[in-house]
């Protein structure tokens, strides 16, 4: 193929055999070293360092090396739009029925509160009582978060703030007010 001053734009090949043939025919020039006779090498052409075209001043060769590789080997990592993963997690956790607070840390906290508030003789809990207490605590927290979210939406915000929790506790009559 003769060198021309202006580069001809070509349409993309339809299948991979055309892509390999088109990249080798485009690559025949000063930037490649063919290993077969006549420059018909398909996959056996060797790329050298990309050079700068004197007419346009653009780099050639880097784009060709990307086109020569099969498309299946370059896996682009998919990035979800902001908020999609959060909604997916919300749906996932709403479907679950198990407890979300780790049992060991919850039991440790219950024992420390019992040690601070109860007399020294009372320091033992049955397993059923701890499970019931954990279920009640998680139910209370879920209700508090949902009421707080309603307060934030009422204030035309999406972000939960401390004042939303305070207002939800005051309006719900749960717990002591600040």
UniProtKB/Swiss-Prot annotation:
Q: Which family does it belong to?
A: Belongs to the histone H3 family.
Q: What is its main location?
A: nucleus
Q: Which residues carry this modification: Phosphoserine?
A: 11
Q: Which Pfam families does the UniProt entry name for this protein?
A: Histone
InterPro entries given in the database record: Histone-fold (IPR009072), Histone_H2A/H2B/H3 (IPR007125), Histone_H3/CENP-A (IPR000164)
- Sites of the modification N6-acetyllysine? 63
The protein's job, in short, is: Histone H3-like variant which exclusively replaces conventional H3 in the nucleosome core of centromeric chromatin at the inner plate of the kinetochore. Required for recruitment and assembly of kinetochore proteins, mitotic progression and chromosome segregation. May serve as an epigenetic mark that propagates centromere identity through replication and cell division.
From the Swiss-Prot or TrEMBL record, give the protein name: Histone H3-like centromeric protein CENH3
The annotated subunit structure for this chain is: Forms a nucleosome-like histone octamer containing two molecules each of H2A, H2B, CENH3 and H4 assembled in one CENH3-H4 heterotetramer and two H2A-H2B heterodimers. Interacts with ORTH2.
What gene does the UniProt entry assign to this protein? CENH3
User: Where found in the cell?
Assistant: Chromosome, Centromere, Kinetochore
Q: Which residues carry this modification: N6,N6,N6-trimethyllysine?
A: 5, 75
Q: Positions modified as N6-methyllysine?
A: 5, 63, 75
| Positions with biased composition (Polar residues) | 43-56
Any one of the GO CC terms: chromosome, centromeric region
Q: GO terms for biological process? A: cell division; centromere complex assembly; double fertilization forming a zygote and endosperm; meiotic cell cycle; meiotic chromosome separation
Q: Where is the composition biased (Low complexity)?
A: 16-36
Q: Which domain of life is it from?
A: Eukaryota
- Write out the domain note: The C-terminal histone fold domain is sufficient to direct CENH3 to centromeres.
Q: Which organism is it from?
A: Arabidopsis thaliana
- Region annotation Disordered: residue ranges? 1-81
Residue(s) carrying N6,N6-dimethyllysine: 5, 75
Q: Which UniProt keywords apply?
A: Acetylation, Centromere, Chromosome, DNA-binding, Kinetochore, Methylation, Nucleosome core, Phosphoprotein
Q: What's an example of a GO molecular-function annotation for this chain? A: protein heterodimerization activity
């Amino acid at each position: 193929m003769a060198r021309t001053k202006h580069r001809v734009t070509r349409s993309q090949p339809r299948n991979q055999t055309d892509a390999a043939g088109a990249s080798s025919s485009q690559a025949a020039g000063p930037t490649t070293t063919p290993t077969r006779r006549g420059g018909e090498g398909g996959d056996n052409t060797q790329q050298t360092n990309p050079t700068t075209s004197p007419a346009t001043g653009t780099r050639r060769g880097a784009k060709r090396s990307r086109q020569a590789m099969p498309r299946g080997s370059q896996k682009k990592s998919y990035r979800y739009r902001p908020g999609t993963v959060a909604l997916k997690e919300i749906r996932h956790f709403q479907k679950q029925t198990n407890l979300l607070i780790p049992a060991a840390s919850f039991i440790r906290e219950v024992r420390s509160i019992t040690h601070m508030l109860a007399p020294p003789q009372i320091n033992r809990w049955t397993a059923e009582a701890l499970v019931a207490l954990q279920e009640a605590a998680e139910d209370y927290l879920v209700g508090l978060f949902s009421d707080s979210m309603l307060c934030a939406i009422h204030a035309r915000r999406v972000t939960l703030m401390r004042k939303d929790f305070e207002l939800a506790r005051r309006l719900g009559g749960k717990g002591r007010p600040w």
